[in-house]
Amino acid sequence: MSNKHTQADVILIGAGIMSATLGSLLKELSPNLEIRVFEKLENPGEESSNEWNNAGTGHSALCELNYTSERTDGSIDINKAVKVNEQFQLSRQFWSYLVNRNLIRNPEDFIRALPHISLVQGEDNVTFLRKRFKALVNHPLFNGMEFSDDNEKLKEWMPLIMDKRDTNEPIAATKIDSGTDVNFGALTRLLFQEFDHKGIDVNYNHSVEDIKRNSEGLWEVKVHDMNDEKIEYHTAKFVFIGAGGGSLPLLQKTGIKESKHIGGFPVSGLFMVCNNPEVIEQHHAKVYGKAKVGAPPMSVPHLDTRFIDGKKSLLFGPFAGFSPKFLKTGSLFDLMHSVKSDNLFTMLSAGMKELPLTKYLIQQVVLSNEKRMEELREFIPNAQSKDWDIVIAGQRVQVIKDTEDGGKGTLQFGTEVVCGEDGTMAALLGASPGASTAVHVMLEVIQKCFPEHLQEWEPKIKEMIPSYGIALSENPELYKEIEVSIEKALGLKNEEPMVIPS
């Protein structure tokens, strides 16, 4: 056993997009902070942040229909859509700041302009989409959105989807050109490259085994150095757990009261990836459909143009699966070990409540490849099985907790920050919109955990993120000004041609 002991101001657990974002923000705000990162794998961004483990959508509610619900009176509630969009704007502003200061280069390596399209079929769904369009089109954050139920126009927008489609059923779409495809794996790697220049101590192949308070009130992190097979102890005033699906088990080890009565339910994902370049060139958009009645939000089908390793790709999904692992590289015992005396009834209550989700997952797990192709053909009628392969995406651990509205054992479909009451410990749990909101979420961590520095740091935060503390939806002129600077910094011009099927 090693007797290595070190002390730092901040320890970040996990080398994904969340730790990358928090580390970058903190070093800009306080360059003298001593920060250490511990990552179990050999490289940054290999789990949930990896480009093959998520859909790469810059979630801004431009096309994701689950962010706009229909009220009982038939009107459309856009509050969640506006909130998600505002949060993504913070990320884009911070990335622009980093690019403008040459802290990261070549933004096309991690972000591309890409139209976002919502597609629905059936009279009721077309009516819903038309109402959604009318509710959003005059909002400054959704400026430029178009609606069409004209087949010829839809062929211009989505030639691959409309080719050989039966047009007897009503069909409609909205399109907005200000959407993006984001390679969060590439972005994470770029941010960690910059960590080397900022003096942040990054340790790969280091697995965190335990977290507890020592007699001095600091957090002591027990780390297994898998390179030398040694145990190390590192202390810090503040610890952030950004370990994806591995965050919940580590949070439980801290023993803080905020870690109690929280459970996690792992859901795995699969995508179909096109292997035919001719087909790939016929599509240039992220096209989101509508989840089937009774299906969970995670099941929304979408056909996505992706840019991975500088190469254009085409993916369809997601299809859900089940594994008790909390990470792709996790253990089959992760789920079982996460059940504690304080969350047992929370987990059991969720099991009783979420029978439809259980049924959905069982149905998804037993799907054959040809059944998946049938779902794909609802998007691409002429899809050929030989042109598509299966890729296994990342694990997502959905948060289960007791809430006032939902009662005991309520499943949460979202991203959640858990902070200790003294502000020395924070963890990031949950799933979508996840990485898209990284800057918003990490600012929340800073506000909750470093309140004594906020007044001092606020001018720098506003330099990095001009709309910090301001609702862009209520300041359209500021939004226009910021949008112009973002497009210039990140090179967000949508000029990609499509090949029309012959």
From Swiss-Prot:
Give its E.C. classification number: 1.1.5.4
Q: Which domain of life is it from?
A: Bacteria
Q: Name any cofactors this protein relies on.
A: FAD
Q: Pfam families recorded for this chain?
A: Mqo
- What are the recorded GO MF terms, alphabetically? 2-hydroxyglutarate dehydrogenase activity; L-malate dehydrogenase (quinone) activity
Keyword Flavoprotein included in the entry's annotation = yes
Q: Which family does it belong to?
A: Belongs to the MQO family.
Q: Does the keyword Flavoprotein apply?
A: yes
Protein name (database record):
Probable malate:quinone oxidoreductase
Metabolic or biological pathway = Carbohydrate metabolism; tricarboxylic acid cycle; oxaloacetate from (S)-malate (quinone route): step 1/1
- For this entry, list what GO says about its biological process: tricarboxylic acid cycle
Traced from the root, the source organism's taxonomic lineage reads: Bacteria, Bacillati, Bacillota, Bacilli, Bacillales
Which reactions does this protein catalyse? (S)-malate + a quinone = a quinol + oxaloacetate
Which keywords does this Swiss-Prot/TrEMBL entry list?
A: FAD, Flavoprotein, Oxidoreductase, Tricarboxylic acid cycle
Query: SUPFAM superfamilies from the entry?
Result: FAD/NAD(P)-binding domain
- The gene that this protein is the product of is mqo
